[in-house]
């Protein structure tokens, strides 16, 4: 990575979780989301100034402490694709550690691909599983495991 000193606005971090993707994993919650889904589970994280500015070096150090116990890392938030440029660099380092990446986004796979945004497409190329689509509180019942509502998809990308 060119610059481990780059910072990301972090809303929270879980060293280990079993509910944010398959297997034991660390979870990085980023700040900032434009979707503003009614009933959002992480509504406080929608503000782009929520949380703390944390360097990628610090985030990687925290993840490394959890290896070899964890299987992967999950990006959640907020919406990780609001920070695709920085997260793409972080994802590259995580993949080099032999970990898989799950990512939750209110954007659909198609919206990301159609955006022609190089940083978003770059991040997507490093994601193993994308849970996509805006949360819909009226569709909570019948949601697939690891999704918040039934309209969301779990896409295995690699």
Regions found by a protein language model. Give the residues of each.
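Short, flexible, glycine/charge-rich loop motifs used to bind or transfer phosphoryl groups or to couple energy/partner
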Residues: 17, 63-64, 118-120, 144
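Alpha-helical scaffolding segments of alpha/beta enzyme cores, especially the outer helices
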Residues: 58-61, 85-96, 118, 122
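Core AdoMet radical
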Residues: 42-54, 68-83, 97-115, 124-138, ...
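Glycine-centered loop/turn positions within well-structured domains
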Residues: 35
């Amino acid at each position: 990575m060119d610059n481990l000193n780059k910072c990301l606005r972090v809303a929270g971090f879980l060293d280990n979780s079993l509910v944010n993707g398959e297997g034991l994993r660390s979870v990085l919650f980023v700040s900032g989301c434009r979707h503003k889904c009614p009933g959002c589970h992480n509504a406080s994280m929608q503000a782009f100034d929520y949380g703390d500015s944390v360097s990628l070096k610090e985030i990687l150090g925290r993840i490394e402490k959890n290896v070899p116990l964890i299987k992967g890392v999950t990006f959640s938030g907020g919406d990780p694709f609001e920070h695709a440029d920085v997260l793409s660099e972080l994802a590259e380092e995580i993949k080099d550690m032999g970990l898989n990446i799950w990512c939750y986004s209110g954007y659909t796979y198609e919206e990301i691909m159609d955006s022609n945004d190089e940083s978003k497409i770059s991040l997507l190329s490093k994601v193993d599983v994308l849970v996509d689509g805006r949360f819909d509180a009226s569709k909570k019942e019948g949601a697939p495991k690891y999704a918040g509502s039934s309209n969301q998809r779990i896409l295995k990308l690699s």
